[in-house]
UniProtKB/Swiss-Prot annotation:
Lineage, uppermost ranks: Bacteria, Bacillati, Actinomycetota, Rubrobacteria, Rubrobacterales
Keyword Cell membrane: yes
HAMAP family for this protein: FluC (MF_00454)
Membrane topology (UniProt): Multi-pass membrane protein
GO biological process, one term: cellular detoxification of fluoride
Protein name from the UniProt record: Fluoride-specific ion channel FluC 1
Molecular function GO labels: fluoride channel activity
Catalytic activity: fluoride(in) = fluoride(out)
Transmembrane segments: 7-27, 35-55, 63-83, 101-121
Length: 124
Protein backbone atom coordinates (compact mmCIF):
# COMPACT_ATOMS: atom_id res chain seq x y z
CA UNK A 1 0.00 0.00 0.00
CA UNK A 2 1.37 3.37 -1.01
CA UNK A 3 1.64 6.06 1.68
CA UNK A 4 -1.04 8.17 -0.04
CA UNK A 5 -3.46 5.20 -0.09
CA UNK A 6 -2.76 4.55 3.57
CA UNK A 7 -3.43 8.19 4.47
CA UNK A 8 -6.65 8.28 2.45
CA UNK A 9 -7.85 5.00 3.94
CA UNK A 10 -7.15 6.21 7.48
CA UNK A 11 -8.96 9.50 6.83
CA UNK A 12 -11.90 7.68 5.25
CA UNK A 13 -12.14 5.27 8.20
CA UNK A 14 -12.19 8.20 10.60
CA UNK A 15 -14.89 9.91 8.57
CA UNK A 16 -16.91 6.68 8.51
CA UNK A 17 -16.70 6.42 12.30
CA UNK A 18 -17.93 9.98 12.73
CA UNK A 19 -20.77 9.38 10.26
CA UNK A 20 -21.72 6.20 12.16
CA UNK A 21 -21.83 8.10 15.43
CA UNK A 22 -23.94 10.90 13.98
CA UNK A 23 -26.38 8.78 11.96
CA UNK A 24 -26.65 6.02 14.55
CA UNK A 25 -27.35 8.55 17.28
CA UNK A 26 -29.90 10.39 15.17
CA UNK A 27 -31.77 7.18 14.30
CA UNK A 28 -31.66 5.97 17.92
CA UNK A 29 -33.02 9.31 19.11
CA UNK A 30 -35.84 9.25 16.56
CA UNK A 31 -36.80 5.59 17.11
CA UNK A 32 -36.33 5.26 20.86
CA UNK A 33 -34.20 3.05 23.12
CA UNK A 34 -36.25 -0.16 22.97
CA UNK A 35 -34.29 -1.62 20.05
CA UNK A 36 -30.84 -0.80 18.56
CA UNK A 37 -32.26 0.82 15.41
CA UNK A 38 -29.24 3.08 14.95
CA UNK A 39 -26.79 0.20 14.66
CA UNK A 40 -29.16 -1.70 12.39
CA UNK A 41 -29.46 1.34 10.12
CA UNK A 42 -25.72 2.00 9.80
CA UNK A 43 -24.91 -1.66 9.21
CA UNK A 44 -27.62 -1.99 6.54
CA UNK A 45 -26.50 1.22 4.82
CA UNK A 46 -22.89 0.06 5.00
CA UNK A 47 -23.84 -3.23 3.32
CA UNK A 48 -25.74 -1.35 0.64
CA UNK A 49 -22.76 0.93 0.06
CA UNK A 50 -20.30 -1.94 -0.12
CA UNK A 51 -22.57 -3.77 -2.54
CA UNK A 52 -22.82 -0.67 -4.75
CA UNK A 53 -19.06 -0.26 -4.67
CA UNK A 54 -18.35 -3.91 -5.44
CA UNK A 55 -20.95 -3.98 -8.20
CA UNK A 56 -19.80 -0.76 -9.86
CA UNK A 57 -16.03 -1.07 -9.50
CA UNK A 58 -15.06 -4.67 -8.65
CA UNK A 59 -11.50 -4.29 -9.94
CA UNK A 60 -10.67 -0.78 -8.73
CA UNK A 61 -8.26 -1.68 -5.95
CA UNK A 62 -7.71 1.88 -4.73
CA UNK A 63 -11.42 2.67 -4.59
CA UNK A 64 -12.22 -0.58 -2.80
CA UNK A 65 -9.41 0.10 -0.34
CA UNK A 66 -10.31 3.69 0.50
CA UNK A 67 -14.10 3.43 0.39
CA UNK A 68 -14.57 -0.24 1.30
CA UNK A 69 -11.82 -0.86 3.85
CA UNK A 70 -11.77 2.76 4.96
CA UNK A 71 -15.06 4.65 4.88
CA UNK A 72 -17.53 1.74 5.00
CA UNK A 73 -15.51 -0.34 7.46
CA UNK A 74 -15.34 2.69 9.75
CA UNK A 75 -19.05 3.30 9.25
CA UNK A 76 -20.30 -0.20 10.09
CA UNK A 77 -19.88 -1.87 13.46
CA UNK A 78 -19.93 -5.57 14.25
CA UNK A 79 -18.78 -5.14 17.85
CA UNK A 80 -21.61 -2.76 18.72
CA UNK A 81 -24.09 -5.18 17.15
CA UNK A 82 -22.77 -7.95 19.40
CA UNK A 83 -22.76 -5.75 22.52
CA UNK A 84 -26.30 -4.49 21.97
CA UNK A 85 -27.52 -8.02 21.28
CA UNK A 86 -25.86 -9.32 24.45
CA UNK A 87 -27.34 -6.43 26.44
CA UNK A 88 -30.82 -7.26 25.15
CA UNK A 89 -30.36 -10.94 26.02
CA UNK A 90 -29.05 -10.30 29.54
CA UNK A 91 -31.93 -7.88 30.15
CA UNK A 92 -34.34 -10.73 29.43
CA UNK A 93 -35.22 -9.41 25.97
CA UNK A 94 -34.29 -12.62 24.19
CA UNK A 95 -36.84 -12.14 21.40
CA UNK A 96 -35.43 -8.71 20.63
CA UNK A 97 -31.88 -10.05 20.80
CA UNK A 98 -32.76 -12.79 18.33
CA UNK A 99 -34.58 -10.30 16.10
CA UNK A 100 -31.55 -8.02 16.16
CA UNK A 101 -29.16 -10.72 14.98
CA UNK A 102 -31.45 -12.32 12.41
CA UNK A 103 -32.79 -8.98 11.20
CA UNK A 104 -29.32 -7.51 10.79
CA UNK A 105 -28.07 -10.54 8.87
CA UNK A 106 -31.12 -10.71 6.60
CA UNK A 107 -31.25 -6.97 5.95
CA UNK A 108 -27.48 -6.81 5.47
CA UNK A 109 -27.46 -9.62 2.91
CA UNK A 110 -30.42 -8.11 1.08
CA UNK A 111 -28.84 -4.64 1.05
CA UNK A 112 -25.48 -5.98 -0.13
CA UNK A 113 -27.10 -7.98 -2.93
CA UNK A 114 -29.35 -5.11 -4.01
CA UNK A 115 -26.40 -2.73 -3.94
CA UNK A 116 -24.22 -5.06 -6.00
CA UNK A 117 -26.94 -5.45 -8.62
CA UNK A 118 -27.59 -1.71 -8.74
CA UNK A 119 -23.88 -0.95 -8.93
CA UNK A 120 -23.32 -3.41 -11.76
CA UNK A 121 -26.34 -2.01 -13.61
CA UNK A 122 -25.12 1.58 -13.15
CA UNK A 123 -21.63 0.66 -14.35
CA UNK A 124 -23.12 -0.76 -17.52
Amino acid sequence: MAPAELALTLAAAGAGSVLRYLLGGWVAHRMGPEFPWGTLAVNALGCLGLGLLQGAAPHDRALLLVLGSGLLAGFTTFSTLMLETANLATAGERDRAFSNIVGTLALGLFALSAGARAGAWAAG
